[in-house]
Amino acid sequence: LQTTLSWSEGTEAVGLMIHTDDELRKWCQLRLEVRHGKILMDRYNRVDGDQYYLDERPVVFRDNKAEVKLIVSGNIMLVYVDDVALACRCYEIGIGEVGIFVEYGNVRCTQTRLLEQ
């Protein structure tokens, strides 16, 4: 997945929900925490006892936008946000939906491409 996310002034976080199931009991989430200057990948699994995992990296956001490249291979996820890399694993997450979210603001998703192999 390749996209450009842009957000309004004052937005706290934007991101992508990945591999979500219909009831949102399991998911992976790429969060761009605009206010805190970091990207993080978090995973949640309510099925196996409220398990929560987190990986993060610092990033400097410019002009209220970021280019995001997400590569998924099995349970391995590699993401680039404005050339800052974050790699992690999403165990026990199956095939699901992809979505976009925003916290306390507005987000726009442009130049989006989904590539499958």
Model-based region annotation:
Residues 1-117:
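Extracellular glycan-recognition regions
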